[in-house]
């Protein structure tokens, strides 16, 4: 990435980060108000999913958690590269830390087609901020009867907590993906889109049994709220 493109990318990400940080705060306030007014206990069921995962992580997944996290990590590279960047995937590899040979610290990799030495920040940093299994569950939630939503929301909370553990483990300065894109740019990108994705998820599970709000309704609500807030700031500046 040239210095000019890097500067423009960082500048736009900083602007976007300011917006998504404010909107994340608004999203949290929305969730708190919804819980206080007892509109739907979806957030409660997500919380149950968080607790179930923490218990499972400690007592049931201990032997295989590293390869599960590696598969999720490499799966994000593959998903974004194949679906959004239209790359051809040649190889997908994931292994447990127990299988590493002496001097080898590579738990997994994805081999794909790309043009020259071009590095896509989208696919390179996808594992650090894209909870793709959670979004797939939110799409699956569209097909579920209202009476069964609590079960799905527990699983959604379970999957999201899994990603929190993955992000905590993988997001390090010495991580090869982060070093490849640059530490400052990487953290800026990761934080920005992590807040963005979490906001969409929080909106998507609101409503529920009384007034179901699905992933598409959540996305719409997020962008409508964001646009209204931007217009409010513009009006304040003009006046």
Per-range role (PLM):
Residues 1-32, 37-42, 48-49, 96-239:
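Metalloprotease/metallohydrolase-associated module, dominated by Zn2+-dependent proteases
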Residues 48-61:
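Transmembrane alpha-helices and immediately adjacent membrane-cytoplasm interface residues
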Residues 58-65, 208-213:
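Helix-to-loop transition at the C-terminal end of transmembrane segments
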Residues 65-85:
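Active-site recognition of the HExxH zinc-binding catalytic motif
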Residues 82-86, 90, 166-171:
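Membrane-water interface of transmembrane alpha-helices
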């Amino acid at each position: 990435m040239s210095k000019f493109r890097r500067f423009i990318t960082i500048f736009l990400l900083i602007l976007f980060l300011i917006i998504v940080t404010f909107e994340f705060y608004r999203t949290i306030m929305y969730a708190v108000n919804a819980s206080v007014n007892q509109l739907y206990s979806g957030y409660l069921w997500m919380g149950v999913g968080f607790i179930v995962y923490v218990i499972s992580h400690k007592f049931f997944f201990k032997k295989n958690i590293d390869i599960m996290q590696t598969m999720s990590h490499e799966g994000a590279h593959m998903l974004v590269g194949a679906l959004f960047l239209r790359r051809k995937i040649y190889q997908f590899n994931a292994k447990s830390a127990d299988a590493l040979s002496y001097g080898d610290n590579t738990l997994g990799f994805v081999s794909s087609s790309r043009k020259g030495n071009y590095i896509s920040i989208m696919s390179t940093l996808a594992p650090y901020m894209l909870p793709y299994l959670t979004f797939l569950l939110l799409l699956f939630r569209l097909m579920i009867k209202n009476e069964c939503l609590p079960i799905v929301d527990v699983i959604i909370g379970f999957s999201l907590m899994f990603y929190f553990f993955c992000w905590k483990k993988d997001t390090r300065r010495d991580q090869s993906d982060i070093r490849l894109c640059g530490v400052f740019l990487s953290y800026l990108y990761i934080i920005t889109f992590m807040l963005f994705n979490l906001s969409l998820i929080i909106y998507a599970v609101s409503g529920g049994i009384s007034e179901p709000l699905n992933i598409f309704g959540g996305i719409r609500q997020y962008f409508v709220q964001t646009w209204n807030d931007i217009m409010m700031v513009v009006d304040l500046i003009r006046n």
